């Protein structure tokens, strides 16, 4: 078959018009050094800071250090497939993480990959892990309470929604227990929780996840894990990923609580990466911007203005001190960034006073305005009573020579210290806390043996549940002690005390 000249020309024209050159331009670089979770590459001239990069082995990397003739890349995974001469290409996007309701109840790594074996996470939204914190105009002062369920904290060091409250202390003083108790106490509230484990042992993290499952707390909790065996880049990213997940709830008019356990290990991971990419070391070999590392993270916790949905993100960072040295570099940095600290003391812990909170050194700088009125009414004298007791404690051995007023102060103090003790993972509703502290500060415990105070407290809760449910409900609703509540409260305590056998 022969084609006419004109037909052949038309076919050729249409073919040329529909011809597409499917050329995809990619900017690539070449790795010239790799080791310890860090690679250096040349050729990535237009790369952005914190841009996600991809190695030819399939591993992801993050542009961490931008220099004149090379890029320092932190490897987000195994470096085993990356060698000198490997190709690394730009993706053109900043590192982001999945966010949203789909992550509730899941355990993930800092890149958003599931670790719990419950299948893929089909998140509808993604958000950059590094974000600028809300400005002054977008914020509202902290005014709603975030109840921890721990008597000593809710009474004397109250925390509000949108606050940053540091939990600081030596190893094995109960820091994680305080944070987990706070998560457990959000069970019947509208607060979503995020627990970020940074550099923790896998067995410890597994135990915490099991506890959260057992107590029904995983229904509203997301766990982000970068364990001790994970490379430093993942430990560095973990808190930022957790914060991004919490910000999704904050920005959608909801409330979230995030626990960073702990930021000491986070600073160490950052120090390791900074030294490997040859950033100049400063005090304790930390880089000069380690303050900014934590300030930009913790400033993202905020209470937003009503026009923006009135959401909040509350942060509980944990710092581990060495031999009680609160004046070390990282502890002082984080103390100055946060809105107060809860200081846990080994001496108190070893004496059996748990939670081992040193009330003198602990403070909440903004939470007072968030405390419910009923708690303010009963706990007003509590801190003062305990301070007077601590002053006179040294004279206890001379008990027989003391005047009656001093003896009464010591006796009241001993009972209050006993009353503030609390077992782990057993948060108490705030209305019951109010009644117990009212009993302590109004002399109901003064003639009860110190050894029976805990028994008195536990039996009192049972008695109230059985006989004075209306009083608990009224306290919960009114959140204040008016004359009617006060008379019911006195009646309940008098009745219970008459039937109590120490």
Curated annotation (Swiss-Prot):
- Keyword ATP-binding included in the entry's annotation: yes
- Gene3D superfamilies reported for this sequence: 2.40.30.20, ATP synthase alpha/beta chain, C-terminal domain, P-loop containing nucleotide triphosphate hydrolases
Top-level taxon of origin: Bacteria
Residues with site note (Required for activity): 362
EC number of this enzyme: 7.1.2.2
Where do the annotations place ATP binding? 169-176
GO cellular component annotations, sorted alphabetically?
A: plasma membrane; proton-transporting ATP synthase complex
Which Pfam family, any one, appears in the UniProt record? Answer: ATP-synt_ab
Q: Where in the cell is it found?
A: Cell inner membrane
InterPro entries hit by this protein: ATP_synth_asu-like_sf, ATP_synth_asu_C, ATP_synth_asu_C_sf, ATP_synth_F1_a_nt-bd_dom, ATP_synth_F1_asu, ATPase_a/bsu_AS, ATPase_F1/V1/A1_a/bsu_N, ATPase_F1/V1/A1_a/bsu_N_sf
UniProtKB keywords: ATP synthesis, ATP-binding, Cell inner membrane, Cell membrane, CF(1), Hydrogen ion transport, Ion transport, Membrane, Nucleotide-binding, Translocase, Transport
Principal place where this protein is found? membrane
Q: Which GO terms describe its molecular function?
A: ADP binding; ATP binding; proton-transporting ATP synthase activity, rotational mechanism
At the top of the EC hierarchy, this enzyme's class is translocase
**Catalytic activities:** ATP + H2O + 4 H(+)(in) = ADP + phosphate + 5 H(+)(out)
Q: How does it sit in the membrane?
A: Peripheral membrane protein
Give the family from UniProt.
Belongs to the ATPase alpha/beta chains family.
Q: Which HAMAP family match?
A: ATP_synth_alpha_bact
Q: What is the purpose of this protein?
A: Produces ATP from ADP in the presence of a proton gradient across the membrane. The alpha chain is a regulatory subunit.
Its assembly, as annotated, is: F-type ATPases have 2 components, CF(1) - the catalytic core - and CF(0) - the membrane proton channel. CF(1) has five subunits: alpha(3), beta(3), gamma(1), delta(1), epsilon(1). CF(0) has three main subunits: a(1), b(2) and c(9-12). The alpha and beta chains form an alternating ring which encloses part of the gamma chain. CF(1) is attached to CF(0) by a central stalk formed by the gamma and epsilon chains, while a peripheral stalk is formed by the delta and b chains.
**What protein does this entry describe?**
ATP synthase subunit alpha
Taxonomy of the source species: Bacteria, Pseudomonadati, Aquificota, Aquificia, Aquificales
What gene name is given for the protein in this entry? atpA
């Amino acid at each position: 078959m022969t084609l006419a000249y004109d037909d052949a020309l038309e076919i050729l024209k249409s073919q040329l018009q529909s011809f597409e050159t499917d050329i995809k331009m990619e900017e690539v670089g070449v790795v010239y050094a790799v080791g310890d979770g860090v690679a250096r590459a040349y050729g990535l001239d237009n790369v952005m800071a914190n841009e996600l990069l991809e190695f030819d082995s399939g591993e992801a990397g993050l542009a961490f250090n931008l220099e004149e003739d090379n890029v320092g890349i932190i490897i987000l995974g195994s470096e085993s497939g990356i060698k000198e001469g490997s190709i690394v290409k730009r993706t053109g996007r900043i590192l982001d993480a999945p966010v949203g309701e789909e992550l509730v109840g899941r355990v993930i790594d800092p890149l958003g990959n599931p670790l719990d074996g419950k299948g893929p996470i089909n998140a509808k939204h993604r958000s950059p892990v590094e974000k600028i914190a809300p400005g002054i105009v977008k914020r509202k002062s902290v005014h709603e309470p975030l109840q921890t369920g721990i008597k000593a904290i809710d009474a004397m060091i109250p925390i509000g929604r949108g606050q940053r409250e540091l939990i600081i202390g030596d190893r094995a003083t109960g820091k994680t227990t305080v944070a987990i108790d706070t998560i457990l106490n959000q069970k019947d509230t509208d607060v979503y929780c995020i627990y970020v484990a940074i550099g923790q042992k896998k067995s410890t993290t597994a135990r915490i996840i099991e506890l959260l499952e057992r107590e029904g707390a995983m229904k509203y909790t997301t766990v982000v894990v970068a364990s001790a065996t994970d490379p430093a880049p993942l430990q560095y990213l973990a808190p930022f990923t957790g914060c991004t997940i919490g910000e999704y709830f904050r920005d959608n008019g909801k409330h979230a609580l995030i626990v960073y356990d702990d930021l000491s290990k986070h600073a160490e991971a950052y120090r390791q990466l900074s030294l490997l990419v040859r950033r100049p070391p400063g005090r304790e070999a930390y880089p000069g911007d380690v303050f900014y590392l934590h300030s930009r993270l913790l400033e993202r916790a905020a209470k937003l203005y009503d026009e923006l949905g009135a959401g909040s993100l509350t942060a509980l960072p944990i710092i581990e001190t060495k031999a009680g040295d609160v004046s070390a570099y990282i502890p002082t940095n984080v103390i100055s960034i946060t809105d107060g600290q809860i200081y846990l003391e080994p001496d108190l812990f070893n004496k059996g006073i748990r939670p081992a909170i040193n009330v003198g050194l602990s403070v909440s700088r903004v939470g007072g305005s968030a405390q419910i009125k009923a708690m303010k009414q009963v706990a007003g004298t509590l801190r003062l009573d305990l301070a007077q007791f601590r002053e006179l404690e040294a004279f206890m051995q001379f008990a027989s020579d003391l005047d009656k007023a001093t003896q009464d102060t010591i006796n009241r103090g001993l009972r209050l210290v006993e009353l503030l003790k609390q077992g782990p993972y057993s948060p108490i509703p705030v209305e019951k806390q109010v009644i117990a502290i009212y009993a302590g500060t109004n002399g109901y415990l003064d003639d009860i043996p110190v050894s029976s105070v805990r028994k008195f407290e536990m039996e009192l809760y049972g008695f109230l549940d059985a006989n004075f449910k209306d009083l608990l409900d009224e306290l919960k609703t009114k959140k204040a002690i008016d004359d009617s509540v006060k008379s019911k409260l006195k009646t309940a305590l008098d009745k219970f005390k008459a039937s109590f056998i120490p």
